Amino acid sequence: MQFLSQALKIAPVSFLAYGVNVAQAEVLNQESLAKQVLHETFGYQQFRPGQETIIETVLEGRDCLVVMPTGGGKSLCYQVPALVLNGLTVVVSPLISLMKDQVDQLLANGVAAACLNSTQTREQQQEVMAGCRTGQIRLLYIAPERLMLDNFLDHLAHWNPVLLAVDEAHCISQWGHDFRPEYAALGQLRQRFPELPFMALTATADDTTRLDIVRLLGLNDPYIQVSSFDRPNIRYMLMEKFKPLDQLLRYVQEQRGKSGIIYCNSRAKVEDTAARLQNRGFSAAAYHAGLENHIRADVQEKFQRDDLQIVVATVAFGMGINKPNVRFVVHFDIPRNIESYYQETGRAGRDGLPAEAMLFYD
């Protein structure tokens, strides 16, 4: 099992301390163990507002709906319980890039995590499945369409999962800003796993969307946490268009090499804007759904590594982006709705340091 063993070599400490050593979990109550996991595995001294109550509620076996701003610490709300509970936590995620980022971060923190996706070889997928069966893997990231395959659900039933976390849960609702039909089938899981605690997480969901998530996922009397959407470290600004390209170039020049994202509403405008930035000597690249997968993956990887300063993108550059040091987000066009605007500007300043969101308007 070379593929899996390489991952687990990176992650021996927390896996042994919180996955196998059941005696320790019996000595410490779950709340104390959760705080220990937070500190020793993830390196935080204390929970952010709302996190501790959510985690305690999940550990009690109750369903939860978590609406927390981008960069607010949603992932820890299921990652900490996953290491306290004795079993497998399944995380539903819509994007391969998002799964990979999460798994890489967990492995770096010493947590035995893996994902199943279409980019893996059959052998790699079998090794991950074996790791779930033997209890080696604590968190499994998977796309909704793969999770809902009958043969996979049969396997999952034998693995005795302890928690199901549905990330980007607004995708299940037609009232949400990013409806995905494959999410709709997740409601069938409640009948299959009636006792399994469910956690739904999203950064943006109005009252109607929240009700839809609860109904469609079959959440039972869920604890609902809606956190403040204030991002005090982000400075929101408006700029009226006169000579928009010149204004944009001047603004980017003022950023002095800082990392940023520029959103445009069309692929043609993305390509044109990226080319003009490149011609002026900026480290910039285009990103949209019309590009081949390997090109998009290369752009994202370079951006994550700080080998690329600016990504000019359509909304396709979205949920999979988890880069802490984005210092500015520009909307060169008016975004399609306020939810999209909030989520996209929320990619700035995830490290808590000052950042800017600039909106150009006519």
Locations of regions flagged by a protein language model:
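Helicase motor core with emphasis on the C-terminal RecA-like subdomain
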Residues: 28, 32, 36-41, 45, ...
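Short, positively charged and aromatic/hydrophobic N-terminal segments
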Residues: 9, 14-24
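Conserved Rossmann-like nucleotide-cofactor binding loop
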Residues: 97
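Cationic, low-complexity basic patches in intrinsically disordered or flexible, solvent-exposed regions
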Residues: 3
